[in-house]
A protein has these predicted regions:
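A structured beta-alpha segment of the ubiquitous adenosine-cofactor-binding alpha/beta core
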Residues: 36-55
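Hydrophobic/aromatic residues within well-ordered alpha-helical segments
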Residues: 13-16, 40, 131, 135
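Short alpha-helical
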Residues: 12-15, 42-43, 64-65, 98
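ALDH superfamily catalytic-core signature
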Residues: 28, 50-51, 56, 63-141
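Short beta->alpha connector loops at strand-helix junctions that form conserved
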Residues: 8-10, 38, 60, 94-95
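Conserved small/polar residues in nucleotide/adenosyl-binding loops
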Residues: 1-5, 141-143
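Conserved small-residue-rich beta-alpha loop and adjacent elements
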Residues: 4-32
Length: 143
């Protein structure tokens, strides 16, 4: 039996996963043990979910896509599936916080850490209206 890990990153942010593959090789992981498969979910992701030689799928993303992954897994070889679907945690920012640059910097880090693929990624900011514009300007700098 040959166990390999295949990683299909989000098509919106594949570079960190590609770099992870490079680092794995540099660290001594045998070639082919970790395969990075960039591509679109509707093609590359669907092919992985339906492939008979894939025994397990772990998916993080939308609820609609999670349902498709589960269906493809069930219709192929009834592979094990782990889903993290839906919600992302918002950050709430009130006007009495005095360091908006820190908020912008931290929010930019939080959303892109781990390619944003976790339920606590903080992909939304709920901001008191009086600080909306200055925080938006600072956020654009840090993204």
């Amino acid at each position: 039996m040959c166990i390999r890990d295949r990683l299909k990153p989000s098509e919106k942010s594949p570079l960190s996963a590609i770099r992870l593959g490079e680092l794995a090789l540099e660290a001594g992981l045998p070639p082919g043990a970790l395969q990075i498969l960039p591509g679109f979910g509707q093609t590359a992701g669907a092919a992985l979910a339906a492939h008979l030689d894939v025994d397990c799928i772990a998916f993080t993303g939308s609820t609609a896509t999670g349902k498709s992954v589960m269906q493809a897994a069930a219709q192929s070889n009834l592979k094990r599936v782990s889903l993290e679907c839906g919600g992302k945690s918002p950050n709430i920012v009130m006007a009495d916080f005095d360091d908006l640059d820190r908020v912008a910097r931290t929010a930019a880090y939080a959303i892109f850490f781990n390619q944003g693929e976790m339920c606590s990624a903080g992909s939304r900011l709920l901001v008191q209206e009086s600080i909306r514009e200055p925080l938006l300007e600072l956020s654009l700098i840090h993204i």
